[in-house]
């Protein structure tokens, strides 16, 4: 049976967390910089533990006003320290609740910049390794962040997005450009199944882009995120694709 991890970014104040949690296998929990706070982190940890969902830190830029989605030019030393800080905060809460972290996935523009910037990606990978070398580093399939994880001898998990458009080189279409979001549910499900089963996706310009789909991201902040999550789970179940971290 084919297996796929299904993850969502939670603890960001979007209100769907309790309903999304039973549908996913991994939760990326906001660590207080781009969203969330100590209380939401604790609530998210408890929800994940209650549903047997793998927990991961979701560090981002300290940019609440823009939800961590605006580019920031910070030195690698700052990226390292802020990543370490956020992982440590969530790990402490998880430990106090009787759990432990399984992975780290950067958020928003930190994620996007690390996909292309080797120095930034190295800073994140170094922080993960120095905190706990057993943690899985999650990044965009084929990106610099995945290569950084390999350089630092971390386990990595290559990610694809159910509702995002792709460029021919496997990068995501920037949110500011046409085709960034796949808004038709049928198309999004079909594209996701193709990425998981065939390892390819049709890019914005019509070319095929190769992707290694080890985990699929569901965005929890969309208006119909819950309904789409259920549809995608049904599609996986119908094809005997096991959802598991």
From Swiss-Prot:
Task: Enumerate the UniProt keywords alphabetically.
Answer: ATP-binding, Hydrolase, Nucleotide-binding
| Cross-referenced SUPFAM superfamilies | Glycoside hydrolase/deacetylase (SSF88713)
Which Pfam families does UniProt cross-reference here? LamB_YcsF
Catalytic activities: 5-oxo-L-proline + ATP + 2 H2O = L-glutamate + ADP + phosphate + H(+)
UniProt keyword 4Fe-4S present: no
According to its UniProt record, this protein's enzyme class is: hydrolase
Single GO term (MF): 5-oxoprolinase (ATP-hydrolyzing) activity
E.C. numbers: 3.5.2.9
Q: Which Gene3D superfamilies match?
A: Glycoside hydrolase/deacetylase
**Does the entry feature the keyword Ribonucleoprotein, yes or no?**
no
User: Which biological processes are named by the entry's GO terms?
Assistant: carbohydrate metabolic process
Q: What does this protein do?
A: Catalyzes the cleavage of 5-oxoproline to form L-glutamate coupled to the hydrolysis of ATP to ADP and inorganic phosphate.
HAMAP family linked: PxpA
Q: Assembly and partners?
A: Forms a complex composed of PxpA, PxpB and PxpC.
The entry assigns this protein to a family as follows: Belongs to the LamB/PxpA family.
Official protein name in the record: 5-oxoprolinase subunit A
Q: Which organism is it from?
A: Cronobacter sakazakii (strain ATCC BAA-894) (Enterobacter sakazakii)
